[in-house]
């Protein structure tokens, strides 16, 4: 009799166990399908732009809402978390081109909904050991040059000489990102990005000129490469 009771008890436990397995398994399948469905729906509504820095220390994250054409830059924390930091100022058309100018500077070139070209710069560092907020324009005061291109930063603004073409930008046409990059704007479009290389030092507290290099990068959706400039004179 005892043996029969034990057998019946074990059989009941196994039956309950099998039922719970079926229930749990069914719930798991439903949750997985729900998650996949939400992911597909979110993927359709949102375009993700992800790019990792050359030294693998920083991640550029931009999410574009396909319905509103609003793109938002996210700042990452601890490598896996991201929070919205700022929205790009122009509605976008879904096309983005990302180029890392330095390990801590990412240039995002994109076309707005009205077909104009713009640049957003993700910055993840500083120069001069980050003692205080600094402005890029004054810190690169002087003449910088490379083959077929020259940049002059003076009291009235920044001038770019490229392939025989002269372009002058007043300070209200210079948009700063962080403390290490600016975008030069003309006719309501981005024209150039100027970035401070990791080797750059302003030497602002000394009597000597800036040292190191800067980089200039043309705003275009076509394939192009940044150009490194050397300091020539003040």
For each of these PLM feature ranges, what is it?
Residues 69-73, 149-189:
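N-terminal glycine/threonine-rich, aromatic-flanked beta-hairpin/loop signature
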Residues 104-106, 141-143, 157, 178-183, ...:
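Short, hydrophobic/aromatic-rich segments at coil-to-beta transitions
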Residues 106-134, 186-234:
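Beta-sheet ligand-binding and adhesion/scaffold domains
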Residues 136-152:
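Tryptophan-anchored aromatic micro-motifs
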């Amino acid at each position: 009799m005892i043996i029969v009771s034990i057998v019946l008890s074990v059989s009941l436990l196994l039956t309950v166990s099998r039922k719970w397995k079926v229930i749990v398994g069914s719930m798991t399948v439903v949750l997985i399908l729900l998650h996949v469905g939400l992911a597909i729906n979110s993927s359709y509504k949102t375009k993700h732009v992800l790019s990792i820095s050359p030294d693998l220390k920083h991640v550029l994250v931009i999410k574009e809402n396909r319905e509103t054409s609003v793109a938002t830059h996210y700042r990452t924390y601890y490598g896996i978390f991201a929070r919205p930091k700022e929205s790009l100022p122009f509605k976008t058309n879904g096309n983005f081109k990302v180029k890392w100018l330095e390990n801590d500077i990412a240039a995002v070139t994109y076309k707005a909904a009205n077909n104009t070209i713009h640049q957003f710069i993700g910055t993840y560092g500083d120069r001069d050991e980050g003692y205080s907020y600094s402005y890029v324009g004054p810190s690169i005061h002087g003449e910088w040059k490379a083959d077929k291109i020259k940049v002059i930063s003076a009291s009235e603004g920044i001038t770019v000489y490229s392939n025989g073409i002269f372009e002058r930008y007043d300070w209200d046409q210079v948009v700063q990102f962080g403390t290490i990059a600016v975008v030069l704007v003309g006719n309501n479009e981005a024209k150039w990005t100027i970035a401070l290389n990791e080797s750059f030092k302003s030497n602002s507290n000394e009597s000597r000129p800036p040292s190191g290099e800067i980089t200039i990068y043309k705003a275009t959706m076509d394939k192009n490469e940044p150009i490194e400039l050397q300091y020539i004179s003040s």
